[in-house]
Amino acid sequence: MKKEEYMPGVNRINTYTDSRFSKKVLNQHGAFLIGDEPYEVEIVSKTDAIIRGKNPNFYESVIENFRFYAEHITNFWDESNNLVKTYPAVELVRISIAKIQPSQFYVDEIKKRAVSDFVYTEEDLVIPLVKWENRNVSVDGHTRLFVAAEKGIQNVYGFYTKADDYVRDFAAEAIRRNIVSPYQLIEVKHRDYEKLWFAFCDEYFSGK
């Protein structure tokens, strides 16, 4: 009987500077550590990505972690162009930025600079959405939407997914603050973002 290989936990890297990873992968939030070993998932199209790392036996766990944030990526390839993992296709819809309701209020200036490096056309944006009160609520990708709006991009791609109730509550609060599209998101300094957004989240979840 083959002994099962031990795998340490998978940790996602959330910073934009780390010499172990390419800048492109860091900007896409595709950088992971398993123990001390780096693993990369690089998005190469609206549906495909390349995975790299020391141990191919760990690829599937990295992919599962990555797809928590990017379930529209359904085909994963290694550097030799071998298919590692595939999932059922996710239907994408083309939608006007003006018709997207944020579930966020602020944009971090540091994250905005990083995102600006890879957002150039509508093809670069795929946003997770939920339907609520006849609105298309963005679950994630608010910085990308803000950057796209500033660059004059009028449409993006999205897919409908599931989300916890807090996303709808956050969207309702955004509406109360007159943030009814990505055009009204407020850019703030990094230290202010951490203070304002984290304080709001802490207060919200402490009351649950």
Predicted regions and their residues:
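Basic- and aromatic-enriched surface patches that contact anionic nucleotides/nucleic acids
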Residues: G9, I13-S22, W132-K208
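Short alpha-helix boundary/capping and kink motifs at helix termini
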Residues: K2, Y6-V139, A149
